[in-house]
Amino acid sequence: MSFKSIFLTGGVVSSLGKGLTAASLALLLERQDLKVAMLKLDPYLNVDPGTMNPYEHGEVYVTDDGVETDLDLGHYHRFSSVQLSKYSTATSGQIYTKVLTKERNGEFLGSTVQVIPHVTNEIINVIQSCADHHKPDILIVEIGGTIGDIESLPFLEAVRQFRCEHPQDCLSIHMTYVPYLRAAKEIKTKPTQHSVQNLRSIGISPDVILCRSEAPLSTEVKRKISLFCNVPEHAVFNAIDLERSIYEMPLLLAKENISDFLLNKLGFSPKPLDLSDWQDLVEALCDKERQHVRIGLVGKYLEHEDAYKSVFESLFHASVPANCSLELVPIAPESEDLLEQLSQCDGCLIPGGFGTRSWEGKISAARYCRERNIPCFGICLGMQALVVEYARNVLDKPLANSMEINPETPDPVVCMMEGQDSVVKGGTMRLGAYPCRIAPGSLASAAYKTDLVQERHRHRYEVNPSYIERLEEHGLKIAGVCPLGELCEIVEIPNHRWMLGVQFHPEFLSKLAKPHPLFIEFIRAAKAYSLEKANHEHR
């Protein structure tokens, strides 16, 4: 086999941070001059997370080739340089759909279709296809869910078979939780022991046990885990809870020397690991002595932080080159004191979303920021809110609206794109990377410093082309359009401190090591506004 595989499973509890761990391992392995590919296997029966409730699943991360994926792929992108595509994700829904389609087409020649071998073979095909497409030195496969979940069993069986076929080229990491009982003042290893026993009963003996814990594990505890879980003591690693930032995870794992162990186990020769640049970025990100800037997020799903995970992280990324310390202030659009809360912020971000709830609150926020010259950034639905607000209060079209909100509006400033009126909702939006031509002399041009960019999209609605001329006549600047059909991509208000809306999702391209330019300029504008307010108060 031309590549090596690392399989990452989780036990004891969910939300252990397997995605962050996988992303951090990718960073460490890339620093060893190895090409890494990543694959997330999700046990749920949905074909993809595109139609799932954000409260249940978190954000939907979109790849360049237009695949709606799990938010863990966002972690992979933000930490590493891996190329993500449709080959980087698979769900039980996709696997079973493929199997049943083959059955209907007669490809199984009348055989009784079963989980073993048909479903497991399809899972193995997914693993192999990811490697064939990305051609990595090492493929990291994260298996969603928790050991013991019935949904994960076909994936684990497929991994067992794959390991049997390629015993020298595969490695299994099992991540567990080691609780600390405060009353007894003891660290308990029994849940980890049972989780490993469960995994071994399926036929997978882990090569590495990575223990998540509140505090560092003693040598005695590691020795006990080693003894009862049948792994060498030097294969028991510790991932303590991070106190400052998730971006400390690669530094923590590097300190544990886990990458050297993995490379030796897989037949590679480890090189000295230099993470000084990453350490500097983390220290800058966590520096609370920098100027304090408050950003209000006026969003629909703020009760669940993961619903806007990429937006939150992109703002923090931008705070490093902007040299400020960010405080993110969640503001419910339905709040009675919405405007009062905004008045205490240095900038406002209106993220994407769907549906009528909270729409008018977003429009109120956009108007407040426009009239009071407060930096404001609208993304996807947020941009549409900026445009509708402008049409209502500057074009004097009080009934202007989006057709998503009111299909009968007399002034449909935002309309459904041609060909988007499909009854089937899953995977039918305008998805993936499209080009955007930037207008010279615009805020967007100052940020990008180029006239053509590629950005990722996820939407059905657009600014109505029949209203663009009137919007421009009344001062709204169309600062970016898609050359493939002249679709409006970026709007700005020229005589404003910084007010910009984008139809795409710039948060899907931001990394700690390479923040997105629009987020940087937004945070810089908010910082300047904060300084201006402070100077005015001290006069």
UniProtKB/Swiss-Prot annotation:
It is an enzyme of class 6 (ligase). One of its GO terms (biological process) is pyrimidine nucleobase biosynthetic process. Allosterically activated by GTP, when glutamine is the substrate; GTP has no effect on the reaction when ammonia is the substrate. The allosteric effector GTP functions by stabilizing the protein conformation that binds the tetrahedral intermediate(s) formed during glutamine hydrolysis. Inhibited by the product CTP, via allosteric rather than competitive inhibition. Residues 294-532 form the Glutamine amidotransferase type-1 domain. Its EC number is 6.3.4.2. The keyword ATP-binding applies. The active site is at residues 380, 505, 507. One of its GO terms (molecular function) is glutaminase activity. CTP binds at residues 14, 149-151, 188-193, 224. ATP binds at residues 15-20, 72. The keyword Nucleotide-binding applies. L-glutamine binds at residues 55, 353, 381-384, 404, 460. HAMAP family: PyrG. Homotetramer. Catalyzes the ATP-dependent amination of UTP to CTP with either L-glutamine or ammonia as the source of nitrogen. Regulates intracellular CTP levels through interactions with the four ribonucleotide triphosphates. Belongs to the CTP synthase family. This is CTP synthase. It comes from Chlamydia trachomatis serovar A (strain ATCC VR-571B / DSM 19440 / HAR-13).
